[in-house]
Amino acid sequence: MSEIIDVIPYYIIPRVSIETISAVACFILVKFMIKPYQVTGEGRYIGLPLGFGFLGASYAISAITYTELASFELIWRFELIFRAFSFVFLAVAYYFSKKPSKNSRCIWNIVFSGLFVILSTAVLVTFVAPQLPQSSYQILNFFVRILSLICIAYIFVHCLREKTIAQDPYAKWVLVAYGLLALSQYSSIVWAADFSYFAFWSTLIFRLMSLGVLLAVTYKIFFCTKKGRVKDEEDPKKR
């Protein structure tokens, strides 16, 4: 960690700015992605907003960490917990994204409840456990990066195998977004392994590009859906 601390004065402003922008982008995505759940009440739709909500929270915590507004020893655990669970929730959401059956709803409820039990336990342990050595942070940090990459890779493959990707132009851009996010996560693993500054900046650039694409696609889908609904209401033939 000493290498990171030594370079903080050089990049703290752009890093905090990027973390803040990333957090805001994720929270905007949550605003859009919560709508299908609000309309249908289907539990399978809650995974995406939860995933991006936790991801945004992890970026916000990261920004706070670099501004030194809170104790690093405590807050880094929350960052790792939220970052790990964000990608797990996203992967689970895509796994259960197909039209639900009675059995799949039951399995989803069990998995969803189990994830929240594990999340609550992890947060509780963060408060009651003694301070962990720096080596533990490095191990957990690397593990979370690997887990995140595995989850993103699964989402990418899942999107790639969807039959609607050829007909839906937006699906292709979602695939691009997750591809960029996978590159970002891979670069972060390289950065954690050998402190390559090229990998470090690649991580941030790919992340911003990914979130930008997701924002554009999500807004376009929401805007077109809303616009189409207004046209249907105005067209007397469709009343």
Specify the residue positions occupied by each region the protein language model found.
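Aromatic-anchored segments of alpha-helical transmembrane domains
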Residues: L55-A60, L115-V128, Y178-S188
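Transmembrane helix-loop junctions in multipass membrane proteins, especially transporters and channels
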Residues: I34, Q38-G41, T67-S71, Y95-K102, ...
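C-terminal transmembrane-bundle signature of multipass membrane proteins
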Residues: I152-R239
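Membrane-helix boundary elements
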Residues: M1-D6, G114-N141
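Juxtamembrane "helix-exit" motif on the non-cytosolic side of transmembrane helices
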Residues: I61-A70, V123-S136, Y186-Y197
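Individual alpha-helical transmembrane segments in multi-pass integral membrane proteins
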Residues: Y10-C26, G43-G114, F142-I146, Y197-K220
